[in-house]
Amino acid sequence: MIKYEIKEKDGYLDMIDLPHNCIFNKVRTGCGGTTIALRNEENYIIAVPTTELIVNKLNSTENLFGLYGDFTPTLKDGLIGYTQRDGVKKIMCTYDKLPKLVELINTTDYRLLVDEYHNLLKQYMFRSTAINGVLDNFREFKSFCFIFNKLTARLDDCRTNHHDRAVNSRGI
């Protein structure tokens, strides 16, 4: 594992972007990891385990497209319209929607943040289809960052160990 010293200010991560192509242990919750992806100037897909996380961010974030629930033609049209707009794009989806999203976008235009990475392992027994969709598609993106806030599993506990490196922030 490669350890990086990550700067923090007032208890929040002080970064322009998340580390790339890694598993990032941010050590504690609420320190702004997801917020970095939502506020920077990079196109991001943010995959999360629950709809509630998306709804929470939709209420507090401008220019965020939330992809959850039934994948209706109206939702698909809205997504396509959003991706064709000018400017930076931020799409937050549940784990199970990622494969459908990959079919509709140019993945190399986006970085992928897989939030609450520890849930991929904890929930595999009852969400294997959704989790396999994440694991089968994350390398399609410009870069990826699997983020979690505690050491809940060893890297080799993954279904497949594709990750190039792990980043452990200290002092946050």
Describe each model-derived feature in a short phrase.
Residues 1-20:
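Pre-Walker A adenine-sensing motif
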Residues 20-24, 43-45, 89-90, 111:
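Residue-level preference for the first positions of well-ordered beta-strands
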Residues 35-69:
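Conserved Walker A/P-loop ATP-binding site and its immediately adjacent core
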Residues 46-47, 91-93, 113, 142-149:
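Structural recognition of the conserved hydrophobic beta-strand(s) that form the central parallel beta-sheet
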Residues 62-103:
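Inter-Walker segment of RecA-like/P-loop motor cores
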Residues 106-143:
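SF2 helicase catalytic motif II
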Residues 159-172:
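Interdomain hinge/linker at the junction between the two RecA-like core domains of SF2 helicases
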